[in-house]
């Protein structure tokens, strides 16, 4: 196995047995590919902006004299890069410029000739761009657009499962759902009449839509029914026999022919009888006249002489009409063939309740339903019906919809028109009748073949189209009214509606969400999330149980584990590891092809629809070396069910054991031993882990950690191979290998690292280099670790030594007892950065001013501010401290004589402003790490702003100069090589300044040319460098684009280090969560016979009932890993020979049964072995992939190899008494996370604060500085204790007795500790409420 440079530093021992067939795909591709489709010009016009433009353009004027045509579009350059947008609070977007052509026609009588053509590029608003990590920067914050799982367009057949009608009769319905346009529903009622609804309006008989499609009654009956033909011969009635139609009927007469009785009267006609009739080739039988009476004729019978209709179609035959027909010479009568079994008379019955009789009346009926109250005219009714389903502007099935529609109706062709036609509607009615007749089945709505994924690109395109349609109306009017000779395309297009539509989508759509940036995993999961909510999706309240449930088609597409707990359960899902969307938007998953029991390396992606036809083996099926199944019977899935199949029947096999789970769930080791509910919590809680100050890779991982860390984009990854030329905390410089260099470039890659930046969740983003000078690196290697990554692997928490035992009740109910050592070593210390803003506005009374001159504030409070009134960087501040001094002008007030006197003495400035400074919120403290000032264009910058500007300019100049020097020196190394090849003394060259090198006289022409070429390159480099500096300088010094009425914004960043403390929430990866109850001194913790104390004590009762046994296996294997690490550490300390070290490590990697990982340490140099050993001394990292992990016997082997008891339990001693505990205790290493539910953020106490307006009770919640609710049960508690005075003050002065609480305050100030409770305000509210009901209620004072 080939290891990359970073992987060689620390190899993870892999317990996986199944071969790796397919690498884990790039985890953010669903976002990036979708947006790429939207942005990139698509010549076919199927996707993205191109499709939107083509669907709206050309726009014709109402009079047809002119049209505006679309030619092409291009996206301009962005003004600010991603980081600048985040700092400035701007949107990362690019201007959209569209080339339009205005064509004006000369109207002749016969044809239109072109009179004039004008082409122009028009600005059409800004399009937000996606960053490389799949996010958008909207108003400075990073957002993610979540993909939506919605019902695919097409036709769906469903039933109410007998719930609608009291009789329990199953009513079937069909629904045609377009991508955009009106829905068309067909439904049966309990009387078996078929109805149609348009857009869920009032229902109409289905015949109305058929008449509107220009069918008359006869044609309708012809389409939907087979005919029985009766002939009148020799005064007898003869039926032309189709034997099949008699099945299941009871013979009401003897069925005989040529004297032979085939079926006796009263007998039920069976398949045997029918076969007999067929065998004897009986084509007709004589029937009694009663048999034809009551039958329904299928066409109109008209007297040819008089033109009188004797009997019209869909009418029952009676004896007299039969006589009439016979008299008039109609000797052949066609009737409808219906029966109760499989040919129901539904359409015929429906025609009877239909009041309309021709196309016009049907159209009027439809018009009345769609536009109630408007008078119908012929033209209006026809237009309305035409526009509903047959006009491309108003109705679009989309390619997906057409494909699903045709597949549902079992048609061969999957392509077709995007609107409906007559055949479509008739085929749907035929199919729903077939289903009612018992042929065919209803669809499963929750099948992933009926739900598709709409990603960012598609949603943005829909929004953009909405904007274009708004513009279209305005353009049409302009084209019709305006003076066309002077008009240019630019005058017609207003970009505002388009910008507004796009902005609204990215800013406030339910699916455009504030990115969850707790840690790299939460970022990746957020981008891979699939939601059933949102525009055109479900709502929480209406979503039933079925939609939320796991469906067999989720296998390998949507994770069955990771979904939120609470009201959104099952509506928000996560994409499985290998899943992707196909061109139609359906989720598909990869499988290996199997032929005659031989598993090939060929991989096919199947969607849920395609998968239904195949037999698919699981990933852990046993295969021999040649690729054949070893067992004759293999467990497989087929049509959503699991059972055993012969190995030669198998068509496909899973690609990997991790295929069914999402990224989050695939990070849980021993997931297969956890109960599903706990696994769900484990997957969700990993997303809440706060990045710790010191990262620590998990000892027990699953092998997915590297993929997550690299794909999330928080690490710096090498773009090209090369050598590390320079490295410091904020920059890495790589000298690129020559074979990867582009022509005429310096061959230098510079990676600037992110330092101590705030994330969306107020955690800290910081990158640290993990390479050293002179190291050779390959493309794709990790150069710098980001938050929660350690040597390019995801590291969300810390490996803790845990013991499962009770300890003095401190781990009752999932509490956690933690050793003080954890705090001392800063194991769970995290950094949190908060941003506080102060906005100075222009008010009616004048501008607000930021200054240190604040009324009624003492010197002490201003001690941390500079002369501009802004806090110093590095100042330590706590709740209530002023960060930015700001005064607001206040309106003139009537002054008291004393105030007038003071004004006269001290001048008037003092009191016409009020203090509105930015203060540190209560309960927050920290260090100021950065201040940024944004000033509106045209407003004078204060001293501090100019200082900050200077600093930024200096830093940028320094950075760019260093970059330039690096490029320059690289260039001069090339020149030096040229000189050396000419035998020129380089020592003399070194004394000359670089610029003089180009003027050295060289005789050889080719070399001279080369030097000239390099000189030109140097000149270009310098020009570019100066240009860059100028651009940056302009960006920094120009005014900022602030919201209307805002003059200045000052942003202050506070950082605070939080150590772990009682009340913080911690969790493992198996859903085992708890709150820290106590931080115990190290000396009191239980310790083993070597004197090593444990870090954490967990309650053993938390395991059996929760059934998350994975944590125990993790603990045991962690112990073994640490034990092996200790042995390596011992060998390093005693300076064992490297050969022995190599042997020992090799042995450790070879442990286990038929593993796929083959590590050959003989290929490693001695230095590499030493470096590996140093990284393994704290424990050998182990990977145990999901469903393919370490077995029990392998864990025992590891424990034995580490010299530990194979039971995993050891004797512990009580730290307080030194006595042995009475039985061995499970001790080992578990990976623990600190979750973002910190007690510091939740602690809250109210003194005096705001009150609710109506009830006059204190508000609730920390944000409102509210109180704690003293509820019904708490009142009972005080009553039970008989604490009447306490209860009285709780219900009055401490709550809503307005006068009482004011007096109380006064009494306390005066030192008089008495209270005078009065009437609680809520009692008055009750009185008012009762009076509002018209009951007069008054209090009588005694």
From Swiss-Prot:
Keyword field: DNA-directed RNA polymerase, Nucleotidyltransferase, Transcription, Transferase
Protein name, UniProt field: DNA-directed RNA polymerase subunit beta
Catalytic activity, as annotated: RNA(n) + a ribonucleoside 5'-triphosphate = RNA(n+1) + diphosphate
GO biological process: DNA-templated transcription
GO CC term, one of those recorded: DNA-directed RNA polymerase complex
Gene3D superfamilies: 2.40.50.100, 2.40.50.150, 3.90.1100.10, DNA-directed RNA polymerase, beta subunit, external 1 domain, DNA-directed RNA polymerase, subunit 2, domain 6, RNA polymerase alpha subunit dimerisation domain
PANTHER family for the chain: DNA-DIRECTED RNA POLYMERASE I SUBUNIT 2
A Gene Ontology molecular function term of the record: DNA binding
EC number: 2.7.7.6
The protein's assembly and partners: The RNAP catalytic core consists of 2 alpha, 1 beta, 1 beta' and 1 omega subunit. When a sigma factor is associated with the core the holoenzyme is formed, which can initiate transcription.
Protein family: Belongs to the RNA polymerase beta chain family.
Origin: domain of life: Bacteria
Entry function: DNA-dependent RNA polymerase catalyzes the transcription of DNA into RNA using the four ribonucleoside triphosphates as substrates.
HAMAP family: RNApol_bact_RpoB
InterPro entries the record matches: DNA-dir_RNA_pol_bsu_ext_1_sf (IPR042107), DNA-dir_RNA_pol_bsu_external_1 (IPR019462), DNA-dir_RNA_pol_su2 (IPR015712), DNA-dir_RNAP_su2_dom (IPR007120), DNA-dir_RNAP_su2_hyb_sf (IPR037033), RNA_pol_bsu_bac (IPR010243), RNA_pol_bsu_CS (IPR007121), RNA_pol_bsu_protrusion (IPR007644)
Transmembrane segments annotated in the record for this chain: none
């Amino acid at each position: 196995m080939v290891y990359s440079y970073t992987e060689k530093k620390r190899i993870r021992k892999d317990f996986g047995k199944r071969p790796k067939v397919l690498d884990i795909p790039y985890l953010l591709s669903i976002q990036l590919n979708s947006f790429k489709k939207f942005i990139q010009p698509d010549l076919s016009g199927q996707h993205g902006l191109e499709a939107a433009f083509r669907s709206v353009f050309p726009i014709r004027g109402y009079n047809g004299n002119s049209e505006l045509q679309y030619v092409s579009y291009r996206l301009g350059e962005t003004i600010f890069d991603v980081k600048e947008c985040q700092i400035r609070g701007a949107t990362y977007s690019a201007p959209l410029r569209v080339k339009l052509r205005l064509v004006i026609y000369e109207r002749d009588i016969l044809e239109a000739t072109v009179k004039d053509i004008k082409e122009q590029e028009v600005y059409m608003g800004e399009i937000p761009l996606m960053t490389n990590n799949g996010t958008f920067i909207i108003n400075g914050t990073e957002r993610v657009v979540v993909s939506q799982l919605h019902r695919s367009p097409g036709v769906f057949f469903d039933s109410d499962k007998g719930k609608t009608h009291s009789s329990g009769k199953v009513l079937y319905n069909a629904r045609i759902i377009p991508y955009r346009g009106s829905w068309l529903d067909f439904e049966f009622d309990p009387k078996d009449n078929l109805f149609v609804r348009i857009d869920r309006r009032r229902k109409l008989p289905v015949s109305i839509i058929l008449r509107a499609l220009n069918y008359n009654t006869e044609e309708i009956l012809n389409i939907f029914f087979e005919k029985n033909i009766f002939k009148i011969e020799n005064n007898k009635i003869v039926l032309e026999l189709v034997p099949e139609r008699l099945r299941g009927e009871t013979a009401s007469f003897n069925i005989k022919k040529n004297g032979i009785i085939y079926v006796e009267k009263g007998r039920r006609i069976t398949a045997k009888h029918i076969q007999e009739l067929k065998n004897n080739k009986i084509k007709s039988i004589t029937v009694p006249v009663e048999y034809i009476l009551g039958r329904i004729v299928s066409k109109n019978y008209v007297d040819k002489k008089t033109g009188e209709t004797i009997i019209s179609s869909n009418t029952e035959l009676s004896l007299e009409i039969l006589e009439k027909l016979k008299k008039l010479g109609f000797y052949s009568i066609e009737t409808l063939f219906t029966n109760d079994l499989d040919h129901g008379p539904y359409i015929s019955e429906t025609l009877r309740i239909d009041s309309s009789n021709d196309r016009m009346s049907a159209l009027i009926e439809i018009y009345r339903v769609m536009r109630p109250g408007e008078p119908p005219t012929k033209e209006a009714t026809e237009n309305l019906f035409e526009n509903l389903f047959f006009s491309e502007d108003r109705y679009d099935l989309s390619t997906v919809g057409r494909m699903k529609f045709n597949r549902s109706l079992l048609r061969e062709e999957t392509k077709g028109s995007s609107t409906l036609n007559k055949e479509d509607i008739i085929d749907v009615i035929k199919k729903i009748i077939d289903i009612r007749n018992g042929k065919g089945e209803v669809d499963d709505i929750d099948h992933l073949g009926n739900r598709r994924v709409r990603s960012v690109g598609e949603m943005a395109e829909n929004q953009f189209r909405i904007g274009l349609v708004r513009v279209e109306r305005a353009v049409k009017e302009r084209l019709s009214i305006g003076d066309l000779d002077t008009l240019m395309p630019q005058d017609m297009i207003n970009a505002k509606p388009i910008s507004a539509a796009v902005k609204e989508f990215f800013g406030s759509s339910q699916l455009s969400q504030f990115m969850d940036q707790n840690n790299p995993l939460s970022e990746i999961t957020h981008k891979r999330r699939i939601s059933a909510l949102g525009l055109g999706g479900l709502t929480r309240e209406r979503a039933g149980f079925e939609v939320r449930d796991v469906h067999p088609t989720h296998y390998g597409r949507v994770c069955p584990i990771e979904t939120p707990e609470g009201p959104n359960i099952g509506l928000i899902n996560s994409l499985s590891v290998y899943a992707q969307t196909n061109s139609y938007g359906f989720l598909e998953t990869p499988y290996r092809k199997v032929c005659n029991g031989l598993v090939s390396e060929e991989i096919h992606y199947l969607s849920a629809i395609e998968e239904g036809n195949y037999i698919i083996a699981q990933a852990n099926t046993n295969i021999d070396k040649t690729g054949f199944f070893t067992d004759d019977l293999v467990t497989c899935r087929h049509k959503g069910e699991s059972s055993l199949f012969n190995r030669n029947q198998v068509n496909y096999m899973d690609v990997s054991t991790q295929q069914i789970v999402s990224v989050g769930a695939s990070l849980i080791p021993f997931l297969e031993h956890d109960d599903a509910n706990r696994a769900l919590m484990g997957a969700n809680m990993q997303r809440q882990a706060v990045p710790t100050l010191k990262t620590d890779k998990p000892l027990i991982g699953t092998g997915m950690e590297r993929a997550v860390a690299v794909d999330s984009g928080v690490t710096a990854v090498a773009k090209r191979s090369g050598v590390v030329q320079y490295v410091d905390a904020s920059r890495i410089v790589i000298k690129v290998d020559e074979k990867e260099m582009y022509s005429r470039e310096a061959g230098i890659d510079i990676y600037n690292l992110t330092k101590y930046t705030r994330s969306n969740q107020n955690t800290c983003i910081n990158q640290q280099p993990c390479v050293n000078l002179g190291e050779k690196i390959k493309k794709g290697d990790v150069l710098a670790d980001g938050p929660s990554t350690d040597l390019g692997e995801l590291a969300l928490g810390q490996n803790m030594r845990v013991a499962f035992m009770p300890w003095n009740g401190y781990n009752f109910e999932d509490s956690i007892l933690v050793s003080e050592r954890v705090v001392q070593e800063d194991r769970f210390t995290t950094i949190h950065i908060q941003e506080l803003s102060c906005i100075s506005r222009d008010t009616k009374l004048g501008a607000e001013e930021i200054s240190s001159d604040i009324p009624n504030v003492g010197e002490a409070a201003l001690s941390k501010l500079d002369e501009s009134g802004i806090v110093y960087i590095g100042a330590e501040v706590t709740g209530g401290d002023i960060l930015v001094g700001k005064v607001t002008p206040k309106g003139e007030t009537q002054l008291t004589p004393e105030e007038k006197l003071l004004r006269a003495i001290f001048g008037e400035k003092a009191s016409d402003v009020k203090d509105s400074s930015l203060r540190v919120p209560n309960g927050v403290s920290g260090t100021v790490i950065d201040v940024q000032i944004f000033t509106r264009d045209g407003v004078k910058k204060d001293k501090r702003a100019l200082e900050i500007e200077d600093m930024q300019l200096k830093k940028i100049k320094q950075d760019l100069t260093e970059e330039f020097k690096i490029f320059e020196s690289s260039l001069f190394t090339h020149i030096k090589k040229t000189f050396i090849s000419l035998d020129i003394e380089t020592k003399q060259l070194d004394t000359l300044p670089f610029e003089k090198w180009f003027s050295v006289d060289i005789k050889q022409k080719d070399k001279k040319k080369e030097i000239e070429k390099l000189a030109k390159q140097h000149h270009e480099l310098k020009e570019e460098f100066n240009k860059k500096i100028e651009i940056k300088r302009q960006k920094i010094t120009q005014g900022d684009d602030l919201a209307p009425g805002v003059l200045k914004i000052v942003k202050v960043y506070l950082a605070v280090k939080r150590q772990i403390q009682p009340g913080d929430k911690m969790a493992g990866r198996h859903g085992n969560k708890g709150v820290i109850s106590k931080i115990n001194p190290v000396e009191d913790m239980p310790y083993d016979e070597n004197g090593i104390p444990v870090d954490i004590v967990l309650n053993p009762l938390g395991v059996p009932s929760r059934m998350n046994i994975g944590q125990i296996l993790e603990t045991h294997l962690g112990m073994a890993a640490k034990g092996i690490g200790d042995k390596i550490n011992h060998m390093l300390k005693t300076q064992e020979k490297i050969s022995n070290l190599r042997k020992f490590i090799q042995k450790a990697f070879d442990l286990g049964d038929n593993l796929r990982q083959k590590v050959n340490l003989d290929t490693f140099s001695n230095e590499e072995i030493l470096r590996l050993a140093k990284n393994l001394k704290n424990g050998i990292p182990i990977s145990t992939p999901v469903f393919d992990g370490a077995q029990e016997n392998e864990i025992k082997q590891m424990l034995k190899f580490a010299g530990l008891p194979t039971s995993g339990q050891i004797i512990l001693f009580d730290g307080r008494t030194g006595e042995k505990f009475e039985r061995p205790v499970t001790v080992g290493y578990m990976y623990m996370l600190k979750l973002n539910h910190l007690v510091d953020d939740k602690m809250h106490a109210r003194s005096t604060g705001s009150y609710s307006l109506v009830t006059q009770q204190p508000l609730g919640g920390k944000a409102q500085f509210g109180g704690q609710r003293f509820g019904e049960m708490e009142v009972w508690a005080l009553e039970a204790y008989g604490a009447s005075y306490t209860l009285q003050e709780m219900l009055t002065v401490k709550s809503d007795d307005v006068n009482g609480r004011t007096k109380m305050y006064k009494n306390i100030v005066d030192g008089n500790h008495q209270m005078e409770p009065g009437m609680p305000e809520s009692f008055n509210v009750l009185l008012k409420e009762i009076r509002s009901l018209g009951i007069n209620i008054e209090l009588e004072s005694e």
